[in-house]
């Protein structure tokens, strides 16, 4: 689960970068 947290943060970061 801990390995999944950074992935989620990266996805959100990419989303914010897109907008």
UniProtKB/Swiss-Prot annotation:
GO terms for cellular component: extracellular region. Expressed by the skin glands. The modification Phenylalanine amide is found at residue 19. GO terms for biological process: defense response. It is found in: Secreted. Its main location: secreted. Keywords: Amidation, Amphibian defense peptide, Antimicrobial, Secreted. Has antimicrobial activity. Belongs to the frog skin active peptide (FSAP) family. Phylloseptin subfamily. This is Phylloseptin-H10. It comes from Pithecopus hypochondrialis (Orange-legged leaf frog).
């Amino acid at each position: 689960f801990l390995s999944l947290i950074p992935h989620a943060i990266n996805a959100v970061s990419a989303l914010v970068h897109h907008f």
